[in-house]
Amino acid sequence: MKKFLVFILLILSANTYAQSGNESLIRQRLKQQTESWNRGDIEGFMETYWKNDSLLFIGNSGVNRGWQNTLNNYRKGYPDTAAMGKLSFDIIMVKKLSSKYYYVVGKWMLTRSIGNLSGHYDLLFKKIKGRWYIIADHSS
């Protein structure tokens, strides 16, 4: 009986580690996003997004599809480093939906000399070829 209990505890702890490991990887991807943004590197910022025509982005201008369209919209909305400012995220929740999907809710803040901006976001991450990518973004 003791061996069985030890076995169950090992399985449960391994599952917890895997969950926290994936959450840590997703948090790292978001950290990479802010670092790229704060260097003025929109293309680097976009590396966290799924480079696919099915990427879904919902923002102030409505529903947009596709990685290239999303990149173009970011370039149009943030043409220089003054407009980009410094980005920070406050991650409110990271929730595992399955072994391949995580849901993230948070707040974004832009500190800028031309006026600060802030809002909330929810993201759907999918594990694709061993890496976590944003496949849907709703930012307001």
Range-by-range predicted roles:
Residues W50, S61, M93, K107-W108, ...:
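A mature extracytoplasmic/lumenal domain signature
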